[in-house]
Amino acid sequence: MCRLLGWVARERRSLRDVLGEESFVAFAQLSRIHADGWGVATADGAGLQGECSTSNAAADPVFRSVATNSTGQAGVAHLRWASPGLPVEPCNAHPFLHFRYAFAHNGGIYPFERLDEILTAEWQAKLQGTTDSERYFLAVLAEMERSNVDVVTALPRVLRRLTEEFTPSSLNAMMLGPEALYVVNCHDASLRPVLPPPEKQSVDELVEATEEEVPYYDLRYRRTDGTVVVASSGFAQPEGGGWRRIENNSLLVVDRATLEVTEIPLDVHIGLAVAADSAGADLR
């Protein structure tokens, strides 16, 4: 389980700059629980660069330096809370970078051990780590190559296969490419992970969410003068501050050239409580 943040701007900007100091501090503090690493990828034109770590972001001066000094016309940031059984290693830190794309995911896909089935041997050879998230990413790139289609076409095809053949808790993701920032909001809204106290960060359990809680998997975006920011829940995102909730089962596309925002409905639905009961998935 993780926290996602992405942006597109008319000019080069850093993570700290696009959030503002108060929201940046609040976002970084989410790593008290999402403490298994951080990553930031930034892009200008077709160029893409990134830095990742297995450290707790709030306690890592390198994170503060990267968040302040690494600038781009677009970017994606990630705070990791590792799923059980997936090692906390640099190769498993998000965002993953392959070719001209960066990708970060929040959620789990079960059964993990079957995920290699969605990749050919050629694409399996490109894997750098052991996560379900990187396999999800490479499946999208593979579909783009196989069918000669763009991200907007490939993503729904991969999402459909993942929901039909596997049991995901959430497929929420951000994919940054040369043309746009693509944000997938596709999750079981009836569930949330149990958030442990900061001193105990290894728990990863899903329970029914209550109506009083801000849903863990919610995503929102905000348009300001020359910048669009998209973020997971966890820090203040008031409607009065311009934040708008992204509908579940939708794909948000932020054009990097125009900053135009398009929300596309997805014919994909996750019902984890039902699927887990029938599939016997381990959702700890």
Language-model-detected regions and their locations in the chain:
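N-terminal segments that mediate ammonia production and transfer
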Residues: 1-103, 109-284
